[in-house]
Amino acid sequence: MAMPDFTMRQLLEAGVHFGHHTRRWNPRMAPFLFGVRNQVHIIDLQQTVPMLDRALKAIRDTVAGGGRVLFVGTKRAAADQIAEAAKRSGQYYVNHRWLGGMLTNWKTITGSIKRLRQIDDMLTGDTHGLTKKEILDITRNREKLERSLGGIKEMGGLPDILFVIDTNKEKLAVEEANKLGIPVVAILDSNSDPRGVTFPIPGNDDAIRAIALYCELVSGAVLDGISAELGASGQDFGAAEELPVDTAAEAAAAEAAPAA
């Protein structure tokens, strides 16, 4: 594996340079803006390129050191791609709704995850003695928990770095990470607040093509980090590279998981 490459042309074609209408801007983003076109702020890709590269290396190095990455993106344009990228690289995600205390009250979240596992065991086991209504209620409860916690139920502890799409919508996630000293990699649009973001990436956080590109690059950086971690432990990642990506990621994730 190798760090994912990207070009200025790819960023342009994905619309990474398009910000919001000038009336919606955040003045704190002024240093990262190139100018205005048709009343829309244009993001300075000359800054985005090195900042994106720096962020990807931070993610890669975190994973190479055995760390976990939490992908966060709950808005409709990002939700599916965030989940797919995390699964593809054997990592974790929140793509439904950020629950208050998801990081800062991890003990309570762990209890909810335990409840989700218990329900899974109940529904896959013997349901004799339960009425249809009871089974339906339990199933609905499970679906609710799965939407909120399904992406982190195998995480086993706090993440070591966050990757965030849309810091305005995910403000609570950024604040909780800051309180715990967890580094944050985030896409910053022209209406974003860069405060609290350790590795900012100026770019469009709404366009589906742009989000797809970010997710592809971040998952690639994660897989490169997994490769480096396995290589450092004397294991051959070459065979895993020949597997489908999902299979390789699952194998790597299992290797990195703490013992029960």
Curated annotation (Swiss-Prot):
- What name goes with this protein? Small ribosomal subunit protein uS2
Family assignment from sequence similarity: Belongs to the universal ribosomal protein uS2 family.
Alphabetized Gene3D superfamilies for the sequence: Glucose-6-phosphate isomerase like protein, domain 1, Helix hairpin bin
| Taxonomic classification | Bacteria, Pseudomonadati, Pseudomonadota, Alphaproteobacteria, Acetobacterales
Q: Which InterPro entries match?
A: Ribosomal_uS2 (IPR001865), Ribosomal_uS2_bac/mit/plastid (IPR005706), Ribosomal_uS2_CS (IPR018130), Ribosomal_uS2_flav_dom_sf (IPR023591)
GO terms assigned for molecular function? structural constituent of ribosome
Cited HAMAP family:
Ribosomal_uS2_B
Q: Does the keyword Membrane apply?
A: no
